[in-house]
């Protein structure tokens, strides 16, 4: 392409002061220019305590590490992931809203991991995707429990349970198994989680 010989591009150089600093600059620069995916912003943002907490939870929970897409904010039908980091970030933020304290990051991460792992036990399809016995795209297509809005709602439910019932919340989550989460159950989900 000889026509590219006359083109110019702007280049900005920054001194490399370490990986965290470079990632923060990436988050700052790209957040206001051509916006990166929300998940990529959450992945690299070093200032947002909630983003750091969401990353910590995903990285420390082997189950979620395998089913959360860290960079993209939308999932293709062929993606092996069930959730995006941005959806998991919003859900974990809802879960710990008013409960967590930034200076107790490790405790907050442990609480979130315990909660999300217990939630995962209520959805056999999640485990089947994790174990590669089901295709993630089909689960996302056929069930609403793998949608970001439901994940965030589960975070809000967890927030209420953790505030009101510190000892019996795991037992209460077992009720999730009794719900018909299929998209075909439009009588329940139409107008609530589906349009």
Question: For the regions a protein language model found, what residue spans apply to each?
Answer:
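Accessory terminal alpha-helical modules
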Residues: 2-195
């Amino acid at each position: 392409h000889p026509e590219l010989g006359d083109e110019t591009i702007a280049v900005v150089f920054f001194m490399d002061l370490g990986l965290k600093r470079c990632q923060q600059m990436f988050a700052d620069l790209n957040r206001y220019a051509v916006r990166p995916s929300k998940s990529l912003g959450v992945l690299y943002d070093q200032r947002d305590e909630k983003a750091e907490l969401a990353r910590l939870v995903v990285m420390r929970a082997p189950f979620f590490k395998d089913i959360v897409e860290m960079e993209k904010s939308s999932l293709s039908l062929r993606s092996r992931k069930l959730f995006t980091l941005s959806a998991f970030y919003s859900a974990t933020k809802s879960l710990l809203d008013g409960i967590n304290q930034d200076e107790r990051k490790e405790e907050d991460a442990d609480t979130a991991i315990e909660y999300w792992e217990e939630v995962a036990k209520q959805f056999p399809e999640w485990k089947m995707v994790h174990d590669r016995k089901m295709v993630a795209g089909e689960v996302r297509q056929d069930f609403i429990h793998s949608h970001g809005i439901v994940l965030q709602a589960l975070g809000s439910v967890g927030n209420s349970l953790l505030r009101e019932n510190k000892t019996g919340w795991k037992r209460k989550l077992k009720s999730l198994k009794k719900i018909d989460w299929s998209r075909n159950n439009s009588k329940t989900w139409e107008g609530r989680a589906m349009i």
